[in-house]
């Protein structure tokens, strides 16, 4: 992450690995300290270009940095008992109200698309770039009995 024109925070996220949200929050705090007046942060650019995705929970946590509340993603599985699972904003991150731009491209997939979609659908961010990969799906690991 770095500053552009002294007042715009630029964050490049290459994957949604463990602690991605924590690292983004830390970088934003550091950048705000570099800006003479914290209130003068004019905007944040979140670069998700060529980000293939990663951990769903990190995608939810990253979205939660910027969202006040609401649904980040809902999933539908094969089990009729669990047709829809909603991952709602988690607490612990103070949302930022600075204007937000998210950059994506054709190699932005999975968790990147979930974050970009959540931020766009809530009106929180403007999405710029080219069409994303189009995966927009979630995989989970299921234990199979030895029998």
Regions found by a protein language model. Name each.
Residues 1-145:
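Cleft-lining beta-strand/loop regions that shape enzyme active-site pockets
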